[in-house]
């Protein structure tokens, strides 16, 4: 390869990797998996090693990894948060150890072995015993200040038993069960699913709304300790010191005193990782002795004394038995793979989403071909590719459907979208999906009106649109004769339907199933327009000017209100007294501060309105003056006369950290 050819290829790879890095670190929505990213960056590294004169300071290989978002306040790290080099085989670990041995003088090096949590790196800064800041890694030099969100994580204490200035680093993550729960809720709400727990954790921690963060049970394992007043001799001592301060460490961390112990650790967790409650994508090995770490040193990007051993994705081969389409509530066609059952990452996989026709054609997937399958993020089944052997060429090339599988109408596809759509508003599959969506937990939340019950009611023609749900009481004699449905079940169903009439406007709006209007957008629209009539009369120009709406969504809303049957539906729902007025945000009546009164005084880390909003959303109240009936005085610096009066009346005075601890139930 000539230098000119290498230069062009290097530039192409850098552009591709920079785009992927933005998707991964900023948008939390990667378009490629880790294996593809790792393969491409190693290709770039190999080329730069061959042509070192082509290395530039802005190459992604010279960066730590992240990109700093402009959504949060910036924070410059006192000590750079470096990334780790990675390896994929035992031979590569042997080579890594030999490089370390050139400095230590022996290949019998002692390493700490730490499971590589698939999450988001975090730095916690404590001063005078109090958590001052929580900061993401960012680009390694500058991170994002996400302190308010970090304070909602139950495993991160707001105070520690030390007055020193201490920095503790670790990983914020979501457990497998919590990840599944969040994706289940997003599915019900019509939101895009998170691809893996790492994306979910990153997307959560970098939320602008800390109330959403608090609702998701983020967790954290800590592993790095910096304290200039109390230097630590080994990495394992560092972990024990973190534990002694009351922070959470991973109990699977071990010291490996020989290469044989390193190898056994790798083999054990390669086999057992699917049994853990959280996702890991490898193992981090660190030279245990801190003095030796400094002697071995650093590159501009990584420590030379640590390495990340990455697990290979478990890939299995199986037969692609069929490709079939399904119709969503908006008419979107999703293609699915029926697979010969195969065990992957601890579970049986017999189906996978194939997204859209372009996805299938790009991979040239054919029915009855042998395909490679893995689990993206060890969670979601994914068909990677077809095995193109001599039998493959004999199979017919797959062709996309041109008619809706439910109503036989011709499918349509716009030039700006990759998906096909059924545009028949009377399509039975769309109607059924829309009924299920309206009754779902994220929308009307009608208990007893699950998928099977709705399907039965629809098949019996007892309900044919959303408004018919509110006429179900008329069909009592038919419904109580359904299998597993008696008098009591019917009474409970009717009670839940009646209760749903009083739902918030945003829930009802979301339940209408307007294309692209998820639960968050529905809340934004409800807050701005206050009722359905104002929204109905909103122009495209008004809607598209809203930051979180944009042009595509604005057009979708305007188009929805142009359809006569949709206007009839709204009028009919109004006739059943379904609420279409914005009532304000719901309060958490089960909170630890519910019905408690607060006086806020002094200077706090956030504005007075910020704390007032939190208190009121948790069904507490903020009052202007201190009395004997006051439950708490939340006091910051320079609190003044209100603090003095609280002390005189023996009213409990709390600081900001104590406030969050009470809120978390500690």
Curated annotation (Swiss-Prot):
The active site is at residue 116. GO terms for biological process: DNA repair; DNA replication. GO terms for molecular function: DNA ligase (NAD+) activity; metal ion binding. Residues 588-666 form the BRCT domain. Zn(2+) binds at residues 404, 407, 422, 427. Keywords: DNA damage, DNA repair, DNA replication, Ligase, Magnesium, Manganese, Metal-binding, NAD, Zinc. Its EC number is 6.5.1.2. SMART domains: BRCT, LIGANc. Disulfide bonds: none annotated. Transmembrane segments: none annotated. One of its GO terms (cellular component) is cytosol. It holds the Pfam family DNA_ligase_aden. It catalyses: NAD(+) + (deoxyribonucleotide)n-3'-hydroxyl + 5'-phospho-(deoxyribonucleotide)m = (deoxyribonucleotide)n+m + AMP + beta-nicotinamide D-nucleotide. Gene3D superfamilies: 5' to 3' exonuclease, C-terminal subdomain, BRCT domain, DNA ligase/mRNA capping enzyme, Helix hairpin bin, Nucleic acid-binding proteins. InterPro entries: BRCT_dom, BRCT_dom_sf, DisA/LigA_HHH, DNA_ligase, DNA_ligase_AS, DNAligase_adenylation, DNAligase_N, NA-bd_OB-fold. Its cofactor is Mg(2+); Mn(2+). NAD(+) binds at residues 34-38, 83-84, 114, 137, 171, 286, 310. PROSITE patterns: BRCT, DNA_LIGASE_N1. Belongs to the NAD-dependent DNA ligase family. LigA subfamily. DNA ligase that catalyzes the formation of phosphodiester linkages between 5'-phosphoryl and 3'-hydroxyl groups in double-stranded DNA using NAD as a coenzyme and as the energy source for the reaction. It is essential for DNA replication and repair of damaged DNA. NCBIfam families: dnlj (TIGR00575), PRK07956.1 (NF005932). This is DNA ligase. It comes from Mesoplasma florum (strain ATCC 33453 / NBRC 100688 / NCTC 11704 / L1).
